[in-house]
A protein has these predicted regions:
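Extracytoplasmic and endomembrane cell-envelope/extracellular-matrix remodeling and assembly machinery
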Residues: 1-192
Length: 192
């Protein structure tokens, strides 16, 4: 019998209880797994079911406990997607110290800044995300729509994106960009 055989059996019982609704029996089993290394997996699964009411402080606390495991970033992504879907922008921003790495979440990040009053930073982020040689994630569409309605890209930014599209051999994007360009730039885009 190895050191963890009893805990392994309890862990399997805890997983079964989680699947069936995580009642009092689950809490008792989980408490018995205080030193079991995979207990954090149980906490992760439980937290996924609590995302709607989870506060930024609770999310940060779990991520601190799960630091060094993939579960910290997995909870962060799930939390951010959930808060973005619910448009709970202050809660979204409450777990971030910097813009996220994933483009989808960056788009939500700048939407959150826009919704909480930081229009300048939001539109700066929109311009940066827009200036690529390919179509961006659909999550960016609401941000781009607000940016376009407010100021949108100038011809220099349109030209920059067109050159990136040209390098990526994305003629469809170049044709799309023409609708935003001034008359002189439209002629230049025809030459690409």
């Amino acid at each position: 019998i190895d050191q963890w055989s009893e805990e392994r059996a309890l862990y399997q019982d805890a997983l079964a209880e989680l699947d069936s609704g995580a009642g009092n029996r689950y809490r008792d089993i989980r408490a018995a797994l205080a030193s079991y290394p995979l207990r954090i997996d149980l906490d992760f699964s439980t937290n996924l079911g609590l995302l709607h009411d989870m506060t930024p402080a609770e999310a940060r606390a779990f991520m601190a406990r799960a630091q060094g495991t993939p579960l910290a970033s997995r909870l962060m992504v799930a939390y951010l997607r959930h808060k973005a879907q619910d448009r709970r922008w202050r809660a979204f921003l409450g777990v971030l110290d910097a813009p996220p790495a994933m483009v989808e979440l960056q788009c939500h990040y700048y939407r959150a800044l826009l919704a909480t009053g930081d229009q300048a930073m939001a539109f700066e982020g929109a311009a940066s995300l827009w200036n690529v040689g390919f179509s961006q994630d659909d999550a960016c569409d609401p941000l781009f729509a607000r940016w376009m309605a407010n100021s949108g890209p100038d011809d220099a930014l349109i030209w920059s994106r067109a050159l990136k599209a040209f390098q990526a051999k994305n003629g469809r994007l170049i044709r799309y960009l023409k609708r935003f360009a001034g008359e002189a730039l439209q002629r230049d885009l025809d030459e690409l």
